Regions:
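Amphipathic alpha-helical dimerization/coiled-coil segments
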Residues: 1-25, 46-48, 97-118
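A cross-family signal for key residues in well-ordered alpha-helices
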Residues: 31, 40-43, 77, 83, ...
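Beta-hairpin "wing" of winged helix-turn-helix
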Residues: 78-87, 94
Length: 118
């Protein structure tokens, strides 16, 4: 692999130095996503019909207890990665695309998910 050619064609991942507050915020969000169960929950919600998932439908596929799933959903909600809407007895969750875009941009991933020039 020609590293020089790849480096020459690709833009740097971070084009500006992160400030302390921005770095802390990004690190917190990435820490939340570092848990495999939370990462799976986020992907399950994002890929659910209509882009939203009911907490009641996430327990079985995740293979965790209802209290554990609720805890992880709360952590994702507190991090601003998903929103929660109460409908009757059930809570429905939806991904916050703008929040994920910030994380994607920090990693230098193009919006269309393509590998870019490399």
């Amino acid at each position: 692999m020609d590293v020089k050619a790849i480096t020459a064609c690709c833009e740097p991942v971070l084009t500006e130095t992160l400030g302390e507050d921005e770095a802390t915020e990004l690190a917190g969000a990435f820490k939340v996503l570092a848990d495999p169960a939370r990462l799976r929950l986020l992907s399950m919600i994002a890929n659910a019909p209509g882009g939203e998932g009911c907490a009641c439908d996430l327990v079985g596929p995740l293979g965790r207890s209802q209290p554990t799933v609720s805890h992880h959903l709360g952590v994702l909600t507190d991090a601003g990665l998903i929103t929660r809407e109460k409908r009757g007895r059930w809570a429905w969750y939806r991904v916050v695309p703008e929040r994920l875009a910030v994380l994607r941009d920090a990693l230098g991933v193009p919006p269309d998910g393509s590998p870019g020039c490399c």
